[in-house]
């Protein structure tokens, strides 16, 4: 688990250096939360304060939000790269990506 966190942190740190772009536009936190509850909650703990995901290997959304180097650009890459072997091959619209990113990053306040 620790090695995975370090690898994810390194990837996010690299993409955190990417200049601001359209991918960093603000999304709708409430729509992102609803999408997460509808689509992501079967594997991830998506609610604020929830730390134990239904799938033991899936990080909670709060863990993702607090990953060093986590930025909107890093989340955009993660949500659109479709290269994570255990995640379903979801195709999100640019607005859905912004919404989920906005919700995830809002969890830093908890």
Residue ranges of predicted features:
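Detector for the c-type heme attachment site
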Residues: 43-50, 66, 80
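Bacterial N-terminal signal peptides that target proteins for export
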Residues: 1-8
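Extracytoplasmic electron-transfer domains, predominantly the class I c-type cytochrome c fold
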Residues: 57-105
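The canonical Cys-X-X-Cys-His
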Residues: 32, 39-47, 100
